[in-house]
Amino acid sequence: MATNFLTKIFGSRNDRLLKQYRKTVARINAMEPDYEKLSDEALRGKTQEFKDRIAQGESLDALLPEAFAVVREGSKRIMKMRHFDVQLVGGMALHYGKIAEMRTGEGKTLTATLPVYLNALSGQGVHVVTVNDYLAGRDAQWMGRLYNFLGLTVGINLPQMPREEKQAAYQADITYGTNNEYGFDYLRDNMVYDARERVQRGLNYAIVDEVDSILIDEARTPLIISGQAEDHTALYVAMNKVVPLLVRQEGEADPRTGEGVTKPGDFTLDEKTHQVFLTEQGHENAERILASQGLIPEGASLYDPANITLVHHLYAALRANHLYHRDQHYVVQNGEIVIVDEFTGRLMAGRRWSEGLHQAVEAKEGVNIQAENQTLASITFQNYFRLYNKLSGMTGTADTEAYEFQEIYGLETVVIPPNRPSKRDDQLDRVYKTTREKYEAAIADIRECHERGQPVLVGTTSIENSEIIAELLNKAGLPHQVLNAKQHAREADIVAQAGRPGMITIATNMAGRGTDIVLGGNVEKAIAALEADESLSEADRAARVQELRAQWKLDHEKVTALGGLRIIATERHESRRIDNQLRGRSGRQGDPGSSRFYLSLDDQLMRIFAGDRVKAIMDRLKMPDGEAIEAGIVTRSIESAQRKVEARNFDIRKQLLEYDDVANDQRKVIYQQRNEILDAPDLGVLIDAMRDDCLADVVRQYVPAESVEEQWDLAGLEKALASDWQVSLALQKEVEGSDAITDEEILEKVQQAAREAFQAKVGQVGAENFTQFERMVLLQNFDTNWRDHLSALDYLRQGIHLRGYAQKQPKQEYKREAFELFRQLIDQVKNEVTRLMMTVQVQSSAQLDEATQAMEDRGEGISNVTYSSPTETGEVETVADAATAAQPAAAGVRVGRNDPCPCGSGKKYKQCHGKLA
């Protein structure tokens, strides 16, 4: 109550920030007449003037009003677009490291040019992060004209680009790319064997477009680079045959009474978490079936150490058969399982689920089974983006997740008011008893809109649902276009024309995101196609363009009069934010529009979270079939269910971060050490320190510290030094011929002898030649042991929750054991490097060069490298590297200079983004 009272007097934090920013907007507006008088050269010259002032110590904050005024003027001249005042406000929020929430159609791409230009003046690089390659390419080309006019360089970072082009892209003042590609480049830079092969040059400032999608939806799973592990093909096939012999249990047993099971079975499913669990009966049946098939010995337990991998494969097979469904979670295409991104509905060609799930689905569908992978490097988006000196982001829907942005990333959300208030009518949800009734009502609404010429966008949560609606529209004789994973190459064009009169467009969730739906259709695309037609004369082209513009004006007025774009959704998503994004496609920049959700009690969200409550209301009201309930209480009940899911997902992401923070601290140490090894001109000091530490451990096994002579085993020490470390010392003779010798002196003698033996080896080929060999040995040992360590951490984490049964805190146990594993890793590296350095026999520098090259080739030649990145569903999906992929169909495309540009412009790469790179 007191808080509300104070907010009324002083305004909210958001109001106060906007008030502060508007004062700066007034200063920028006051400069506009002066900048309008400048010639193009004088305006461009401002960039160098600003750089000089920064070099003399002036801050970016002090330059902000002038820099923003320059960008606005440049945009007016080059783009024929003037930044609105609210866009200047959004630009300030981004510059100050905040998240700017700007509604769809408010011009986020143009807003970003302001802080991008200002921060690029420092010369330390600005990374603009987008959700897909199409948007990265489009924005780099579109806004690149403005940056180039103002004297800044622009690069684009695409997957599978040659290293030299990637380096050029990162050296540019401004770099456009996707979140996954930035993260993978960071990991790859920490896997190189030559410092000159690194592509990134420090992480200075990032602006994340669609920040909610990248930092929240995709933050549950890490980016992973992996190589191929051993083949278990026969096991996946065998496990797939076991699954039909196991029966699903219905109902859940009460832990105290054991009651509640309506039909006993072998396993239970948890649809919320996508997990499967064997019951007591299930364990016994599984063991009996596996024994009968010869997979485990008769009478053996499923949890014997030798059978642990079988449990992993059995669970993967159960999940594949009962929780992952064809045409919803994946499609079968050209004999391969292709994952469907449930948020965007796109096909993720070449990507793979991890932990054996993908192979289990392949076995289920009877297609070729490809091998599992071993993790080479990984990082979560939370930890990658927190490496930047400054981070900001923009989206149409961030306010529902403002707490998470603040809690995890330390980012404040600023809600930017629209340039023109929204006129969209968001109608109450209509809830029907059955799916059939829901679809009938939705089709009737679509037909009504189509008959009067109002465009409709139908939003669905999966490909399966979009195909159901497409089929129903076909039966109803209503023409429509489908925008889902199966046609995503054309999605930007389809979305652009979705505002034409009478147009019906079906879209899976946010497919085609980043492209505005203009009422009356996008006339600019049609004009661009005309201008590219060389068969037309100038006069014909001008006449056709005039016709197009006149027709568009009529269409625009007609659609506006009919109420704008109508949004019809057939299911609520588990996140309110995704529903708001769908609604946000309508009513852009003050246009009219309307939206309605048609739901049924059979929908997944309703069934799991809100169905019983709404069903009780319907039963109480004695609703006849075909009648819908439409009331605020129902909509609020559904939103309450969505809040529960959002809270659960936040907890998952927060827990992921708490666990990954442990690995992150270790990752920083390893990567820092690795970079020091790559950059160091001489590694002698590091090698000497490792050898001294290592030999101290060896000596202490035979000659304990502060011990007397009777406790020493000098014969054992001499033997160990000679056989394992190639150090020959007559320690027994020395001790016998000496009156008094301490354990410390023994240690010093051993270390000195090892030092001399090593120096003699270095002397044979020269210190300079030996340094590169040392570098390869160190890097390869760090990499090999780090990979094994990542697998060990993964196994540790999978079972750590069981410590809770022993009244121990799993997170604390994980931290303690992870630290112990890391200590072992460092000791292992020291031992392996020292032993190799002491035992290697090198006769000539040519022989040494050969050995060095062989080690480098072995380190870089990991077979079938794949890149796993998250989708919004939280599952890990994997794309094969074009350079190393065993399956060409799964490989990404390397862009040749004369190939079509991947951005979809239709131009050659060298004439499009090749120029930017």
Curated annotation (Swiss-Prot):
Keywords per UniProt: ATP-binding, Cell inner membrane, Cell membrane, Cytoplasm, Membrane, Metal-binding, Nucleotide-binding, Protein transport, Translocase, Translocation, Transport, Zinc
* High-level lineage: Bacteria, Pseudomonadati, Pseudomonadota, Betaproteobacteria, Burkholderiales
The encoding gene:
secA
Recorded protein name is Protein translocase subunit SecA
Can you name one GO molecular function term for this protein?
Answer: ATP binding
Q: Which organism is it from?
A: Acidovorax sp. (strain JS42)
| HAMAP family the UniProt entry points to | SecA
Details of cofactor binding: May bind 1 zinc ion per subunit.
Q: Which sites bind ATP?
A: 87, 105-109, 516
- Sections of the chain in a coiled coil: none
Q: An example of a Gene Ontology BP annotation on this entry?
A: protein import
Q: Where in the cell is it found?
A: Cell inner membrane; Cytoplasm
